Protein backbone atom coordinates (compact mmCIF):
# COMPACT_ATOMS: atom_id res chain seq x y z
CA UNK A 1 0.00 0.00 0.00
CA UNK A 2 2.76 2.38 1.00
CA UNK A 3 4.64 1.51 -2.19
CA UNK A 4 1.54 2.17 -4.27
CA UNK A 5 0.96 5.54 -2.59
CA UNK A 6 4.63 6.47 -3.03
CA UNK A 7 4.50 5.55 -6.72
CA UNK A 8 1.32 7.62 -7.16
CA UNK A 9 2.97 10.56 -5.37
CA UNK A 10 6.01 10.35 -7.66
CA UNK A 11 3.84 10.24 -10.79
CA UNK A 12 1.90 13.34 -9.70
CA UNK A 13 5.16 15.16 -8.85
CA UNK A 14 6.70 14.37 -12.24
CA UNK A 15 3.53 15.50 -14.01
CA UNK A 16 3.56 18.79 -12.08
CA UNK A 17 7.24 19.39 -12.90
CA UNK A 18 6.60 18.71 -16.57
CA UNK A 19 3.69 21.15 -16.54
CA UNK A 20 5.89 23.79 -14.93
CA UNK A 21 8.57 23.18 -17.54
CA UNK A 22 6.06 23.59 -20.37
CA UNK A 23 4.68 26.71 -18.75
CA UNK A 24 8.15 28.25 -18.51
CA UNK A 25 8.92 27.32 -22.10
CA UNK A 26 5.76 28.92 -23.44
CA UNK A 27 6.41 31.94 -21.22
CA UNK A 28 9.83 32.40 -22.82
CA UNK A 29 8.29 32.23 -26.27
CA UNK A 30 5.59 34.65 -25.17
CA UNK A 31 8.23 37.09 -23.97
CA UNK A 32 9.93 37.00 -27.39
CA UNK A 33 6.63 37.33 -29.17
CA UNK A 34 5.47 40.13 -26.89
CA UNK A 35 8.46 42.34 -27.80
CA UNK A 36 7.86 41.95 -31.52
CA UNK A 37 4.11 42.38 -31.04
CA UNK A 38 4.72 45.54 -28.99
CA UNK A 39 7.09 47.01 -31.59
CA UNK A 40 4.71 46.14 -34.42
CA UNK A 41 1.73 47.64 -32.58
CA UNK A 42 3.57 50.93 -31.94
CA UNK A 43 4.91 50.98 -35.47
CA UNK A 44 8.24 52.14 -34.07
CA UNK A 45 11.64 50.45 -33.75
CA UNK A 46 13.60 52.31 -31.07
CA UNK A 47 17.30 52.37 -31.95
CA UNK A 48 20.28 53.18 -29.73
CA UNK A 49 23.17 54.86 -31.55
CA UNK A 50 26.02 57.30 -30.82
CA UNK A 51 25.40 59.98 -33.41
CA UNK A 52 29.09 60.94 -33.18
CA UNK A 53 30.82 58.08 -35.04
CA UNK A 54 31.32 59.16 -38.65
CA UNK A 55 30.61 57.70 -41.21
CA UNK A 56 28.41 55.17 -39.41
CA UNK A 57 26.22 57.36 -37.21
CA UNK A 58 26.69 61.14 -37.10
CA UNK A 59 25.06 64.50 -37.78
CA UNK A 60 25.42 66.09 -41.20
CA UNK A 61 27.35 69.34 -40.81
CA UNK A 62 24.93 71.33 -42.99
CA UNK A 63 21.52 69.97 -42.02
CA UNK A 64 22.39 68.56 -38.56
CA UNK A 65 20.34 65.52 -39.60
CA UNK A 66 21.35 62.15 -38.16
CA UNK A 67 22.82 60.07 -40.97
CA UNK A 68 25.47 57.46 -41.75
CA UNK A 69 25.85 53.89 -42.94
CA UNK A 70 24.41 52.22 -39.83
CA UNK A 71 21.59 54.76 -39.69
CA UNK A 72 20.58 54.13 -43.31
CA UNK A 73 20.79 50.34 -42.96
CA UNK A 74 18.57 50.18 -39.87
CA UNK A 75 16.15 52.70 -41.40
CA UNK A 76 15.77 50.45 -44.44
CA UNK A 77 15.31 47.40 -42.19
CA UNK A 78 12.60 49.22 -40.23
CA UNK A 79 10.89 50.35 -43.44
CA UNK A 80 10.70 46.78 -44.72
CA UNK A 81 9.13 45.72 -41.43
CA UNK A 82 6.49 48.44 -41.70
CA UNK A 83 8.13 50.43 -38.89
CA UNK A 84 9.67 53.83 -38.31
CA UNK A 85 13.18 53.96 -36.80
CA UNK A 86 13.27 56.25 -33.74
CA UNK A 87 16.86 57.00 -32.72
CA UNK A 88 18.00 57.53 -29.12
CA UNK A 89 21.52 58.98 -29.12
CA UNK A 90 23.72 57.62 -26.34
CA UNK A 91 27.43 57.62 -25.51
CA UNK A 92 29.04 54.31 -26.42
CA UNK A 93 30.02 53.35 -22.87
CA UNK A 94 26.36 53.75 -21.81
CA UNK A 95 24.94 51.96 -24.85
CA UNK A 96 24.46 48.48 -23.40
CA UNK A 97 23.20 49.85 -20.09
CA UNK A 98 20.54 51.67 -22.12
CA UNK A 99 19.67 48.50 -24.00
CA UNK A 100 19.42 46.54 -20.75
CA UNK A 101 17.19 49.26 -19.27
CA UNK A 102 14.87 48.95 -22.32
CA UNK A 103 15.50 52.53 -23.47
CA UNK A 104 15.70 51.05 -26.96
CA UNK A 105 14.99 47.78 -28.76
CA UNK A 106 18.20 47.49 -30.76
CA UNK A 107 21.67 49.02 -31.01
CA UNK A 108 22.91 50.11 -34.45
CA UNK A 109 26.49 51.25 -33.89
CA UNK A 110 29.05 48.91 -35.45
CA UNK A 111 28.72 46.39 -32.63
CA UNK A 112 31.08 43.42 -32.52
CA UNK A 113 29.77 40.36 -30.71
CA UNK A 114 33.00 38.78 -29.43
CA UNK A 115 32.68 38.42 -25.66
CA UNK A 116 29.03 39.51 -25.70
CA UNK A 117 27.38 36.38 -27.12
CA UNK A 118 26.07 35.19 -23.75
CA UNK A 119 24.58 38.54 -22.75
CA UNK A 120 22.87 39.67 -25.96
CA UNK A 121 21.16 38.50 -29.13
CA UNK A 122 22.62 39.54 -32.48
CA UNK A 123 21.42 39.93 -36.04
CA UNK A 124 23.27 38.55 -39.03
CA UNK A 125 26.38 40.58 -39.90
CA UNK A 126 26.06 43.65 -42.10
CA UNK A 127 29.66 44.95 -42.17
CA UNK A 128 33.15 43.48 -42.41
CA UNK A 129 36.20 45.65 -41.76
CA UNK A 130 39.60 45.64 -40.07
CA UNK A 131 40.96 47.27 -36.96
CA UNK A 132 43.79 49.76 -37.40
CA UNK A 133 46.17 51.51 -35.04
CA UNK A 134 46.33 55.30 -35.35
CA UNK A 135 49.28 57.34 -34.09
CA UNK A 136 50.83 60.79 -34.49
CA UNK A 137 52.42 61.32 -37.88
CA UNK A 138 55.98 61.21 -36.48
CA UNK A 139 55.40 58.18 -34.22
CA UNK A 140 57.76 55.21 -34.50
CA UNK A 141 54.99 52.74 -33.60
CA UNK A 142 54.80 50.46 -36.62
CA UNK A 143 53.77 46.99 -35.42
CA UNK A 144 51.90 45.18 -32.64
CA UNK A 145 55.05 44.65 -30.55
CA UNK A 146 55.57 48.42 -30.38
CA UNK A 147 52.27 48.92 -28.56
CA UNK A 148 53.34 47.29 -25.29
CA UNK A 149 53.67 49.86 -22.51
CA UNK A 150 52.26 52.68 -24.65
CA UNK A 151 49.06 54.58 -23.79
CA UNK A 152 46.01 53.80 -25.93
CA UNK A 153 42.96 56.08 -25.88
CA UNK A 154 39.94 53.75 -26.03
CA UNK A 155 36.23 53.55 -25.29
CA UNK A 156 36.27 51.18 -22.34
CA UNK A 157 33.47 48.87 -23.49
CA UNK A 158 34.56 48.55 -27.14
CA UNK A 159 36.18 45.52 -28.76
CA UNK A 160 39.05 47.81 -29.78
CA UNK A 161 39.82 48.36 -26.11
CA UNK A 162 40.24 44.60 -25.81
CA UNK A 163 42.72 44.57 -28.72
CA UNK A 164 44.74 47.36 -27.10
CA UNK A 165 44.84 45.51 -23.78
CA UNK A 166 45.89 42.26 -25.44
CA UNK A 167 48.79 44.12 -27.08
CA UNK A 168 49.94 45.33 -23.66
CA UNK A 169 48.88 48.97 -23.88
CA UNK A 170 47.95 51.14 -20.92
CA UNK A 171 44.38 52.36 -21.36
CA UNK A 172 43.15 55.95 -21.20
CA UNK A 173 39.35 55.90 -21.23
CA UNK A 174 37.55 58.16 -23.73
CA UNK A 175 34.00 58.67 -25.02
CA UNK A 176 34.74 58.02 -28.69
CA UNK A 177 37.10 58.20 -31.63
CA UNK A 178 37.11 62.01 -31.82
CA UNK A 179 38.39 62.27 -28.25
CA UNK A 180 40.94 59.51 -28.90
CA UNK A 181 42.45 61.43 -31.81
CA UNK A 182 42.43 64.63 -29.78
CA UNK A 183 44.44 63.01 -26.98
CA UNK A 184 46.95 61.62 -29.48
CA UNK A 185 47.52 65.06 -30.99
CA UNK A 186 47.89 66.57 -27.52
CA UNK A 187 50.51 63.97 -26.61
CA UNK A 188 48.34 62.53 -23.83
CA UNK A 189 48.01 59.18 -25.64
CA UNK A 190 50.28 57.36 -28.07
CA UNK A 191 47.72 55.51 -30.14
CA UNK A 192 44.19 54.29 -30.58
CA UNK A 193 42.68 51.14 -32.07
CA UNK A 194 39.60 51.76 -34.20
CA UNK A 195 37.73 50.75 -37.32
CA UNK A 196 39.62 51.15 -40.60
CA UNK A 197 36.59 52.51 -42.45
CA UNK A 198 35.92 55.14 -39.79
CA UNK A 199 39.56 56.24 -39.72
CA UNK A 200 39.88 56.42 -43.51
CA UNK A 201 36.73 58.52 -43.64
CA UNK A 202 38.08 60.81 -40.91
CA UNK A 203 41.40 61.31 -42.69
CA UNK A 204 39.59 61.99 -45.96
CA UNK A 205 37.03 64.47 -44.63
CA UNK A 206 39.01 66.24 -41.90
CA UNK A 207 42.20 66.99 -43.79
CA UNK A 208 44.10 66.25 -40.57
CA UNK A 209 47.75 65.54 -41.45
CA UNK A 210 48.89 65.16 -37.84
CA UNK A 211 47.81 61.54 -37.43
CA UNK A 212 48.27 58.41 -39.54
CA UNK A 213 47.34 54.74 -39.76
CA UNK A 214 50.39 52.92 -38.40
CA UNK A 215 49.25 49.35 -39.19
CA UNK A 216 46.26 47.00 -39.38
CA UNK A 217 45.61 44.84 -36.34
CA UNK A 218 43.82 41.62 -35.46
CA UNK A 219 41.43 39.66 -37.63
CA UNK A 220 38.69 41.13 -39.85
CA UNK A 221 35.89 42.48 -37.69
CA UNK A 222 32.21 41.74 -38.38
CA UNK A 223 29.50 43.98 -36.98
CA UNK A 224 25.89 43.25 -36.05
CA UNK A 225 22.75 44.82 -34.63
CA UNK A 226 22.52 44.01 -30.90
CA UNK A 227 19.37 43.12 -28.94
CA UNK A 228 18.49 42.12 -25.39
CA UNK A 229 18.48 38.39 -24.73
CA UNK A 230 15.04 37.01 -25.45
CA UNK A 231 14.35 39.26 -28.45
CA UNK A 232 14.15 36.19 -30.71
CA UNK A 233 11.14 37.04 -32.87
CA UNK A 234 12.29 40.62 -33.44
CA UNK A 235 15.76 39.35 -34.41
CA UNK A 236 14.18 36.89 -36.85
CA UNK A 237 12.26 39.67 -38.60
CA UNK A 238 15.32 41.94 -38.74
CA UNK A 239 17.37 39.10 -40.25
CA UNK A 240 14.67 38.48 -42.83
CA UNK A 241 14.84 42.14 -43.88
CA UNK A 242 18.66 42.04 -44.01
CA UNK A 243 18.54 38.90 -46.15
CA UNK A 244 16.19 40.61 -48.61
CA UNK A 245 18.47 43.67 -48.70
CA UNK A 246 21.49 41.50 -49.49
CA UNK A 247 19.64 39.57 -52.19
CA UNK A 248 18.19 42.60 -53.99
CA UNK A 249 21.41 44.63 -53.78
CA UNK A 250 20.12 47.34 -51.44
CA UNK A 251 22.69 46.66 -48.70
CA UNK A 252 25.52 46.69 -51.23
CA UNK A 253 24.21 49.97 -52.66
CA UNK A 254 24.18 51.64 -49.23
CA UNK A 255 27.71 50.37 -48.51
CA UNK A 256 29.07 51.66 -51.81
CA UNK A 257 27.45 55.04 -51.20
CA UNK A 258 29.41 55.47 -47.97
CA UNK A 259 32.65 53.61 -48.68
CA UNK A 260 33.00 53.22 -52.43
CA UNK A 261 33.00 49.44 -52.05
CA UNK A 262 30.78 46.68 -50.71
CA UNK A 263 31.75 46.19 -47.07
CA UNK A 264 28.59 44.23 -46.25
CA UNK A 265 29.96 40.83 -47.36
Name every feature range the model reports, one short phrase each.
Residues 51, 128-135, 196, 200-243, ...:
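Periplasmic-binding protein-like
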Residues 16-19:
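C-terminal motif of bacterial Sec signal peptides marking the signal peptidase cleavage site
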Residues 43-49, 144-157:
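Short loop->beta-strand "edge-of-pocket" segments that line small-molecule binding or catalytic clefts
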Residues 79, 84-146:
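Acidic, polar ligand-binding/catalytic clefts
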Residues 28-109:
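Extracytoplasmic small-molecule ligand-binding "clamshell" domains
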Residues 82-84, 100-109, 186-198, 209:
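Alpha-to-beta junction loops
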Residues 21-23, 71-80, 158, 222-262:
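Extended ligand-binding regions for polar small-molecule ligands
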Residues 71-72, 86-97, 157, 172-186, ...:
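Short helix-initiation/N-cap motifs at beta->coil->alpha
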Amino acid sequence: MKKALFALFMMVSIAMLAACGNSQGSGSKSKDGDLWASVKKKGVLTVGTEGTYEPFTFHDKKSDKLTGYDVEVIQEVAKRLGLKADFKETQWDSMFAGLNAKRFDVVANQVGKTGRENQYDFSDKYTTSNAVVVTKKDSTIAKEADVKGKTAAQSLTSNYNKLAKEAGAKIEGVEGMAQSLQLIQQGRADLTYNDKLAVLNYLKTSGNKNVKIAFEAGQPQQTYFAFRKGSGELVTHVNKALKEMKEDGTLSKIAKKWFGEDVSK
